[in-house]
């Protein structure tokens, strides 16, 4: 999986068309209303639903107010530069409420739990679980078979573009409410205890804890047993 360059992301945001998509429930004498091709109109003679850009739909509503009895607008963003990731082709388990922006890479059999937030350019390896309310900032990279605990934050780096992003190597367990700051690498097989604030690189196969996080021991059999990654949680239905 390839990490996006910060300048690529900046250019994408700069040059993207800023959009305010809306969903509008509409009621009235709709046979008298003409809808342009740029607006998706699922309507009958009396009612329906419109999908499109607010500026276009507002014009329709204003110009046809004598035919429209009532309408309700659903709107969740304004001048948004980055669309949400199209999830339909992703071979992972993604639960309701996860917010995943476009240009995120998600490996096979990964798990994204409710209300996780994953920003543009982030990379999630195969078999990795991102738990509830975790945040992966721009370009944060997590390897294979990891667990990022509930409420954890992996800081993002888009600006300044020269800054190094967070990198979490394979087989890492990050506890709940951990904060990993920009530029930190968490080495393969490491464990970060719940609530730690990680400001420096974590050596492979060590346990770190505290604020700021410090090495408290090397990984032993007891730690492995307590932080075991269960593949059963990552299984998907066979493809049909």
From Swiss-Prot:
Superkingdom of this protein's organism: Bacteria
Pfam families: DapH_N, Hexapep, Hexapep_2
PROSITE patterns given in the database record: HEXAPEP_TRANSFERASES
Pathway the protein acts in: Amino-acid biosynthesis; L-lysine biosynthesis via DAP pathway; LL-2,6-diaminopimelate from (S)-tetrahydrodipicolinate (acetylase route): step 1/3
Keyword Repeat attached: yes
Any GO BP annotation: lysine biosynthetic process via diaminopimelate
InterPro entries: DapH, DapH_N, Hexapep, Hexapep_transf_CS, Trans_hexapeptide_repeat, Trimer_LpxA-like_sf
Entry-linked Gene3D superfamilies: Hexapeptide repeat proteins (2.160.10.10), Malonyl-CoA ACP transacylase, ACP-binding (3.30.70.250)
Reactions performed catalytically: (S)-2,3,4,5-tetrahydrodipicolinate + acetyl-CoA + H2O = L-2-acetamido-6-oxoheptanedioate + CoA
GO MF annotations, alphabetized: tetrahydrodipicolinate N-acetyltransferase activity
Keywords, in A-Z order: Acyltransferase, Amino-acid biosynthesis, Diaminopimelate biosynthesis, Lysine biosynthesis, Repeat, Transferase
EC code(s) of this entry: 2.3.1.89
Function: Catalyzes the transfer of an acetyl group from acetyl-CoA to tetrahydrodipicolinate.
HAMAP family: DapH (MF_01691)
Family of this protein: Belongs to the transferase hexapeptide repeat family. DapH subfamily.
Protein name: 2,3,4,5-tetrahydropyridine-2,6-dicarboxylate N-acetyltransferase
Originating organism: Bacillus mycoides (strain KBAB4) (Bacillus weihenstephanensis)
Gene coding for it: dapH
